[in-house]
Amino acid sequence: MMTASQRYDTKIHRRVTRTVMVGDVPIGSEHPIAVQSMINEDTLDIDGSVAGILRLADAGCEIVRVTTPSIGHAKAMGKIRSALRAQGCKIPLVADVHHNGTRIALEVAKHVDKVRINPGLFVFDKPDPDRQEFSKEEFDAIGDRIKETFAPLVQVLKEQNKALRIGVNHGSLAERMLFTYGDTPQGMVESAMEFVRICDSLDFHNIVISMKASRAPVMLAAYRLMADTMDREGFNYPLHLGVTEAGDGDYGRIKSTAGIATLLAEGLGDTLRVSLTEAPEKEIPVCFSILQALGIRKTMVEYVACPSCGRTLFNLEEVLHQVRNATCHLTGLDIAVMGCIVNGPGEMADADYGYVGKGPGVIALYRNRDEIRKVPESEGVEALVQLIKDDGRWVEPD
């Protein structure tokens, strides 16, 4: 976890985690934080599933999850993978396995790069409405059954050098965990750690862990406790971040960001998904925007722009739109658009280029802190583009 000095550092210090390969994509603290999503097509619809995966890949998604609720769905993954490879798409595939999923997981492991299991459902017993408690003997007996059921999958993944996600959901904890720990972050962590310890006992370490909840405070507490527990027990597995069932629109994006960005700022997280009730490809820009905003992974131009006030000397909203349209393909640059000289030059000091209102009908162009020239406002955007070209930092858009 963060040291006292790191807490006040402007650089994010990631928790050190081991590298887990998911196909050709590495997940771990030595690698860029990977962006993933999940298609919403029926897996038995081969053509539809392939099309959905290709749309995600085109949007920049780096890992795609697919639901496999039956053996038939698991076998369909082989056809989906072959169809993708025939079209030149090698994006890693993850199978989502839930209720009593051993047979399904063993089949689908042949066709995917990672298997995701839900500890609360992998060995599933229907809840007993008359039960009042679990004795230690009963709790341990179920644990033994879980290990017996889970071990064959671990062995297959180990032999095939595939990865596993232990994906806990707050809403689907096993009955014995609820009775013992309650509907709490601790219950989520213990649910995951039971499976982590089994993997460790079988010398299998290609593990990624998620602790998702639909409420950000629960999710935050669960991930923090999970990281602390792993550190205490000597495990350094990567974390997959997400707020599940976040909804749609602005609020869904804000809710996801509240959870994911908070943990990323604390150094936790090695891969992420923003779960929206929208077309899956709409999740991807949100993921990259979160990473960009924190300075963790730069995949677009960073625009710095003031909110505008009575001192603004031009239509800032319109000009920002024009500047963005002209330069949005110049990934890696920081460009500032500021309304006046009162705060503009200082607040944009870290930008590569600046566009600042200088006087009525006049703007000044900056390179870093240095004013380069003044030009009429009507020529401002064109002059900014020319300055970038003069510096050799311009590339033509695709």
UniProtKB/Swiss-Prot annotation:
Top-level enzyme category: oxidoreductase
The protein's name in its UniProt record: 4-hydroxy-3-methylbut-2-en-1-yl diphosphate synthase (ferredoxin)
Residues engaged in binding [4Fe-4S] cluster: 306, 309, 340, 347
Catalysed reactions, semicolon-separated: (2E)-4-hydroxy-3-methylbut-2-enyl diphosphate + 2 oxidized [2Fe-2S]-[ferredoxin] + H2O = 2-C-methyl-D-erythritol 2,4-cyclic diphosphate + 2 reduced [2Fe-2S]-[ferredoxin] + H(+)
Keyword Metal-binding assigned: yes
Cofactor(s) it depends on: [4Fe-4S] cluster
Record bears the keyword Plastid: no
GO process annotations (BP): isopentenyl diphosphate biosynthetic process, methylerythritol 4-phosphate pathway; terpenoid biosynthetic process
Reported function: Converts 2C-methyl-D-erythritol 2,4-cyclodiphosphate (ME-2,4cPP) into 1-hydroxy-2-methyl-2-(E)-butenyl 4-diphosphate.
Associated pathway: Isoprenoid biosynthesis; isopentenyl diphosphate biosynthesis via DXP pathway; isopentenyl diphosphate from 1-deoxy-D-xylulose 5-phosphate: step 5/6
Gene Ontology MF term list: 4 iron, 4 sulfur cluster binding; 4-hydroxy-3-methylbut-2-en-1-yl diphosphate synthase activity (ferredoxin); iron ion binding
Keywords, comma-separated and alphabetical: 4Fe-4S, Iron, Iron-sulfur, Isoprene biosynthesis, Metal-binding, Oxidoreductase
Cofactor note: Binds 1 [4Fe-4S] cluster.
Pfam families per the UniProt record, alphabetical: GcpE
EC number: 1.17.7.1
Listed PANTHER family: 4-HYDROXY-3-METHYLBUT-2-EN-1-YL DIPHOSPHATE SYNTHASE, 4-HYDROXY-3-METHYLBUT-2-EN-1-YL DIPHOSPHATE SYNTHASE (FERREDOXIN), CHLOROPLASTIC
Entry superkingdom: Bacteria
Family membership: Belongs to the IspG family.
